[in-house]
């Protein structure tokens, strides 16, 4: 998804990309909600998941904007302060246990992120655009962590279909006016990409909600670091972004951290 968004970002404004991602996601979300016959949400469900929709919009727009300014692997690497924040917030807010294996895994993943950032961003020259992009990523990581904690809180209380419905329909409605303000008419080929993007978003969010309903946030958080491996690969294949030794060293730490949690 991130690679597709980065490819679309030179041609379309951030608000439009985010809107179309959620707009196409609405189709799958509504269909899933109707198929499961989950019923109408309660007032409590509406309140919490409405807040999640707002957090989702802030996360998406800030990270999509960052992708237009930073190499793919760098943007993903910076965003991976989020798993550490998620695990810590899970312990502080939800009372989840933070044992030594998870702490070591988080530390390994965070050190891996620092290696990649220091190696790639440092060598490229940290200019104004990169600084703005990095700030946008860090903001998105903070908001995303709050969103994940709220998802963990609601995933055991609300029907999965309602969670998916709010995340897509709510975010789409919030983004409608900003997207129209900066609208650039998409080509047919790009509309197909947006449709794929929306579908992938719904599938990914469904799997994420399903996982957080069954596993503590702290244990799942380090697994997200594996995404960085794909970011490096797609950055190389589609954007000619060649990773350096620091990237591979950081990726190795990330993988080690992920396997530690699985041996818990």
Give the positions of each predicted feature.
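Juxtamembrane C-cap of transmembrane helices in multi-pass membrane transport proteins
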Residues: 1-12, 17, 61-72, 78, ...
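Loop-to-transmembrane-helix transition segments
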Residues: 33, 38-62, 131-140, 185-203
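Specific alpha-helical transmembrane segments that line the substrate/conduction pathway
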Residues: 16-23, 65-95, 217-236
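Cytoplasmic-side transmembrane-helix entry/capping segments in multi-pass membrane proteins
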Residues: 43-55, 98-111, 130-134, 155-168, ...
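Transmembrane alpha-helical segments that form core, pore/gating elements
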Residues: 14, 29, 123-183
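Hydrophobic transmembrane alpha-helices of multi-pass small-molecule transport proteins
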Residues: 101-120, 246-262
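C-terminal-most transmembrane helix of multi-pass membrane proteins
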Residues: 226-264
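Helix-helix packing/entry segments at the starts of transmembrane helices
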Residues: 76-81, 154-170, 205-236, 263-264
């Amino acid at each position: 998804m991130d690679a597709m968004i980065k490819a679309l970002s030179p041609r379309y404004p951030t608000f439009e990309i985010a809107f179309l991602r959620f707009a196409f996601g609405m189709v799958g979300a509504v269909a899933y909600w109707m198929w499961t016959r989950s019923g109408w949400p309660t007032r409590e469900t509406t309140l919490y998941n409405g807040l999640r929709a707002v957090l989702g919009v802030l996360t998406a727009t800030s990270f999509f904007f960052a992708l237009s300014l930073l190499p793919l692997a760098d943007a993903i690497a910076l965003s991976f302060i989020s798993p550490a924040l998620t695990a810590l917030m899970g312990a502080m807010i939800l009372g989840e246990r933070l044992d030594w294996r998870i702490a070591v895994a988080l530390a390994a993943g965070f050190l891996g992120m620092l290696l990649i950032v220091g190696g790639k961003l440092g060598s490229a020259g940290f200019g104004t655009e990169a600084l703005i992009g990095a700030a946008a990523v860090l903001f998105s990581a903070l908001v995303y962590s709050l969103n994940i904690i709220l998802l963990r809180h609601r995933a055991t209380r609300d029907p999965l279909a309602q969670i998916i419905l709010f995340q897509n329909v709510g975010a789409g409605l919030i983004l409608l006016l900003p997207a129209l303000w900066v609208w650039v008419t998409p080509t047919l080929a790009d509309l197909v990409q947006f449709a794929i993007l929306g579908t992938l978003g719904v599938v990914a969010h469904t799997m994420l909600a399903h996982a957080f309903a069954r596993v503590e946030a702290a244990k799942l958080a380090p697994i997200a670091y594996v995404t960085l491996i794909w970011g490096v690969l797609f950055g190389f294949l589609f954007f000619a972004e060649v990773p350096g030794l620091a990237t591979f060293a950081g990726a190795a730490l990330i993988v080690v951290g992920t396997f530690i949690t699985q041996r818990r």
